[in-house]
Amino acid sequence: MGGVVGWKRKMVRKERAEIAAQNIEVKVLEGTEIGPQIWQLFYQLYERTYAKRNGTRGYLTEAFFQEIALTMPEQIAMAVAYQSDIPIACALYFYDADTLYGRYWGSVAEFSYLHFELCYYRGIEFAIEKGLTKYDAGAQGEHKIIRGFEPIKTHSLHWIEHPQ
């Protein structure tokens, strides 16, 4: 947090303290540590997030998440929040040799600052622990700027194979 000005550091500390005050514990699981029950919960929360946002179920299927869990576990991590040992929220990350990519998140209910804890602060910690030099927390959101993320130009290229 060295590059974050004083009032922002104070805000981050306050937000993180609020997580503890809500009796929320967060664990970051990697690859095969993410069991089928957590994946199932994650997908339910993913759908819930999209339903709230735009009335859809999201554009990725449960089969997609099952497939990536099997085929690329070494590039996946998930921050899971627990309250009284019950999982209540998840944030999915992908990573390569130098970059962490934060992409999807969901929660069973609204909790103060939990989105920031899972999607930003735990991601930053994970990236540091893994020696990753960049954290791409995704597009949009002015709330990211005051938490230390600077806007950058991003290029994206996708190839979607169709079986026909």
Language model features with spans:
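Acyl-donor binding region in acyl/amide transferases
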Residues: 97-159
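A conserved beta-strand-loop-helix scaffold within acyl/acetyltransferase catalytic domains
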Residues: 1-112, 158
